[in-house]
Amino acid sequence: MAKLFGTDGVRGVANTELTAELAFRLGRAGAHVLTRQGHSKKIIIGRDTRISGDMLEAALVAGICSVGVDVYKIGVLPTPGIAYLTRKLGAGAGVVISASHNPVQDNGIKFFGPSGYKLPDELESQIEKLALDDQAELPRPTGGELGRLYYVEDAVDQYVDFAKATISTDLKGLKIVVDCANGAAYAVAPRILSELGAEVIPIFHRPDGVNINAHCGSTHPETLMEEVVKQGADLGLAHDGDADRVLAVDHLGNLVDGDQIMVLCAKHLKSKGKLRKNTTVVTVMSNLGLYKALERSGIEVVETKVGDRYVLEKLLETGARFGGEQSGHIIFLQHNTTGDGIITALQLLAVVKETGMSLAQLAGQMERYPQILKNVQVKDKNYVMNSPIISEAIRRFERDLAGQGRILVRPSGTEPLVRIMVEGKDMAELQSIVDKMAEIVGNI
């Protein structure tokens, strides 16, 4: 792992790339960097349900305590819950052990600053440099100066109460199927919905350490789509492993993606005078239908790179408070400092309740243009992306689309993949283009 930090912290195969030794080093370096500027000398740690979380958590705790910083352990909790508690508990930093939607063999370590925001690149670089430097002179306190380990017994309760308070309506009369991805949402998502009055049918809510994201959750919503229809539910919700995203399913079993959720939430916020700057921040992956739907409603759309950290940066830069990604990472900055699948689900459900419309009716406000995505595994994604062959191929195929579509080729921020997206009106033409682009990328 030549460069540790990617777009969403440090990721790798647990115990080969992301080892206990590396976690220990990251704990030492992170605690030193994030608490030396007068910030609180306590760090909170939370994780998802992966089997490797125990090992990495123990190593991080040891590293943090070894530089004289206290650890407050909160156990399994959604990533946005850790961001929230970092702020609420007055910690100098928060640490999340999770690889989000990735398979079980992967894990990750991500830091939040004292305000609950992901770290800027320069702080991550400082932590990385110290973690990799065998000669780094970090503190080695002794005796009573060592850090201690504490347990936050009511962490789940605190996050549940916080999330519930973000909407002013109950959910009585709604029958909801919720897919917890056998991940961090398993204890909180069904409970929150139930306490707000919904009839809740949880699925994939029994984590065993190895079944996280396994044919379930927001990256595999097929079972949820079937279950919503089978149960006669009003809608379904699908979280990923760390519950920082959500997708929905209407009563007919149709998937409602992040773009559609953003359109209906943005329009509802605007109708209540609560859409700050009359702006929604989206990424280059958002569907053309989103742009058209928001433009029809007189809402300004600001575009940024893929990744919720870039959505957040653009929100802070523009003063807007709402934005997100097609994948279901959606930020309501008036509520939390990062993408929050639980809070997004609650805002969506509040729109359903307050408008009296079904999710199918609401989602129909956006016409989704056909979009085909394809991932190509590569050895060196940067080499591929810098090849002039790619830019020439994009120009050639976009000429064929004649202004009625677009092609986007980008590297994954967390995996050795190049992602291809082709969008337009003719599915056969799109499939032909994406297959040809994938072949070109694979041969570079």
From Swiss-Prot:
What's the gene? glmM
**Cofactor(s) the record lists:** Mg(2+)
PANTHER family found in the cross-reference section: PHOSPHOGLUCOMUTASE (ALPHA-D-GLUCOSE-1,6-BISPHOSPHATE-DEPENDENT) (PTHR42946:SF1), PHOSPHOHEXOSE MUTASE (PTHR42946)
Q: In its UniProt entry, what is this protein called?
A: Phosphoglucosamine mutase
Per the record, its GO cellular-component terms are:
cytosol
Q: Which GO terms describe its molecular function?
A: magnesium ion binding; phosphoglucosamine mutase activity; phosphomannomutase activity
Give the organism the record lists.
Desulforamulus reducens (strain ATCC BAA-1160 / DSM 100696 / MI-1)
Keywords tagged on the record: Isomerase, Magnesium, Metal-binding, Phosphoprotein
Q: Which InterPro entries match?
A: A-D-PHexomutase_a/b/a-I, A-D-PHexomutase_a/b/a-I/II/III, A-D-PHexomutase_a/b/a-II, A-D-PHexomutase_a/b/a-III, A-D-PHexomutase_C, A-D-PHexomutase_C_sf, A-D-PHexomutase_CS, Alpha-D-phosphohexomutase_SF
Modified residues annotated as Phosphoserine in this record: 100
* HAMAP family named in the record: GlmM_B
- Give the Gene3D superfamilies listed for this entry: Alpha-D-Glucose-1,6-Bisphosphate, subunit A, domain 3, Alpha-D-phosphohexomutase, C-terminal domain
- EC number(s): the record gives 5.4.2.10
This protein's record includes keyword Isomerase: yes
Q: How is the cofactor bound?
A: Binds 1 Mg(2+) ion per subunit.
